[in-house]
């Protein structure tokens, strides 16, 4: 190799090495192509408990409407230890309304309580208080930015996902294109943090399961997923519709689903769901994530949640 050739070779090598170093450093700035989570395989370890059914006990400014002063109070920091002691479950879902604060001091205190209890946050259901499909772009941006806030909170608490409501003004028809545009931004942000954004068939007007699936398929981002709720769609539809809804939702589910066997409306009328069929559908779709117990039935939440756990253990293999 002559001097000129050798000099050029060394120069090129230096450039390539510098480029490789830059790429290696920048790799941490690029989002993962898909979520990288490891799920437990033992049935009980796939069970979580939602804080929503226990809202009448939880002390938090945003939860005053649900707090029953006749019952003993509970701060959210006490919830994970209760879940472990009472139910022998080590996963839970804290609702956004149940956080008395989201400042860094409280979040550190909360995470310490979670770790001390030997528990894990597996999802944070939140309401962005805005609409992802509003006709006003500025209002859609509010939803996206609030969603990003909860993604950051999920990072601080070690949660793999958030569940956000889609939201929408009462007289505005849900719009796939505007919803997809907004949620593309949130999913892309979640990807940079390895945090999944989940959509639940919760509100039967703004979050119809088949509307959700259209949005998911349009966005086509592995960080935007479905959160199938066993019974929510039964409030306005029949079992056949629910079966089709669960099949559509579980095709797009990844890490979290809500298990319940019944749900009541504002008039005290309860609807039940075919739980066995829901688990059959989840298994057929090779769902490997968590099932969070979200009791909504008659009676009190401790016994109701235990019943859901016992029922779930019959079907998980």
Predicted segments with their positions:
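Residue-level detector of anion-binding/catalytic polar loops
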Residues: 15, 120, 160, 196, ...
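Structured beta->alpha junctions
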Residues: 98-99, 168, 201-203, 238, ...
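P-loop/Walker A phosphate-binding loop and immediately adjacent motor/lid segment at beta-alpha junctions
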Residues: 114, 274, 278-290
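Active-site groove signature of glycoside hydrolases
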Residues: 153-174, 193-202
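Short acidic/histidine-rich active-site segments
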Residues: 292-296
